[in-house]
């Protein structure tokens, strides 16, 4: 009987810990890239750096605050209703994909030049930047 009570208490404690971490801790304890010093670069230069040498670009940009300036190619929404921007040159093999951190509407239009600050998380076919905030 003691064994069953111990297992139930352990499962309840584990569930409570998971709930706290998922819904409370992770909402309040996250990185504030806007307060960090950032690397300032154009969208074209950033995507070119990753195309030229991905390892070298990762050592310079990966998990760092980056302030990117470039032309907006598209504006979309992701599954979490966050605005996503694609910046760079039309027809280029690789561009910069930015997910904005807030759900506020964007006033800029496709074709306009914009500066966004966020955290570079690497490159797939495009360079990925998360937690972006329009400057």
Regions found by a protein language model. Give the residues of each.
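OB-fold and OB-like single-stranded nucleic-acid-recognition modules
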Residues: 2-135
């Amino acid at each position: 009987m003691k064994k069953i009570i111990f297992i139930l208490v352990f499962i309840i404690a584990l569930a409570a810990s998971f709930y706290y971490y998922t819904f409370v801790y992770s909402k309040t304890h996250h990185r504030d890239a806007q307060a960090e010093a950032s690397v300032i670069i154009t969208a074209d230069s950033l995507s070119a750096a990753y195309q030229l040498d991905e390892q070298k670009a990762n050592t310079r940009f990966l998990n760092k605050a980056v302030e990117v300036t470039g032309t907006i190619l598209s504006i979309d929404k992701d599954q979490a209703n966050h605005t996503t921007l694609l910046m760079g040159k039309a027809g280029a093999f690789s561009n910069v994909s930015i997910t904005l951190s807030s759900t506020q509407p964007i006033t800029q239009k496709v074709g306009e030049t914009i500066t966004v600050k966020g955290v570079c998380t690497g490159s797939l076919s495009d360079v990925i930047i998360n937690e972006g905030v329009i400057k």
